[in-house]
Amino acid sequence: MTSKIFSPKISAVIESLRKLPTIGKKSSQRLALYLLDKSPETARAIANSLLDATANIKKCVYCQALTEDDVCNICSNTNRDDTKLCIIESMLDMIAIEEAGIYRGKYFVLNGRISPLDGVGPSELKLDILQRIIADRKIDEVILAISPTVEGETTAHFISQMIAKDIKISRIGFGVPFGGELEYLDQQTLLHAFNARTNI
């Protein structure tokens, strides 16, 4: 139906926008028409910044967060606690934790969860890099800040099994409902979750 109303180029923009998370048919049409009709300079600015970012952004060699440099701002910050490592699913989780101001250690970003049905295993999550980081650094606590979903539980269990027994492993707790995503929690709930973390 879309192709009968819009030209091929407009349809292509709409379909591209639909590939973004949480953007459905109506939203993609609204965004495309706004950018093309009302704000073409914004469209060009977005396109240019995306092209520049995709050409220059890479993953931090330590935590796997997106960065322009080999080492991200948090990993290179000498004021952070090197003995604590918080394992999270995405950079959105990192943003939520940082904005809550509840943690001063380092991170490791999984960029997903173990999900055999989706073809995501330990190698896709770069768990070999995680294992190397834990072995090389003097880490005394690993905090699993992984969403309590079925895939999250599987991932947390797998990671806890691969960590040396002399390292404390804890899991954030109170306030995170089963199936909940960390990035959507408010700061107070995150604070309680971190303070009420339980040892594994």
Swiss-Prot record:
* Pfam families the UniProt entry points to: RecR_C, RecR_HhH, RecR_ZnF, Toprim_4
Carries keyword DNA repair? yes
| GO MF annotation list | DNA binding; zinc ion binding
Cite the SMART domains for this sequence: TOPRIM
Q: Where is the signal peptide?
A: none
Q: Start and end of every Toprim domain?
A: 83-177
Positions annotated as zinc finger (C4-type): 60-75
- Give UniProt keywords alphabetically: DNA damage, DNA recombination, DNA repair, Metal-binding, Zinc, Zinc-finger
Concerning PROSITE patterns, the annotation shows: RECR, TOPRIM
In the record, biological process GO terms are: DNA recombination; DNA repair
Family assignment from sequence similarity: Belongs to the RecR family.
Write down the NCBIfam families for this protein, in alphabetical order: recR (TIGR00615)
Q: Write out the function statement from the record.
A: May play a role in DNA repair. It seems to be involved in an RecBC-independent recombinational process of DNA repair. It may act with RecF and RecO.
This one is known as Recombination protein RecR
The source organism is: Francisella tularensis subsp. novicida (strain U112)
What would be the name of the gene that encodes this protein?
Answer: recR
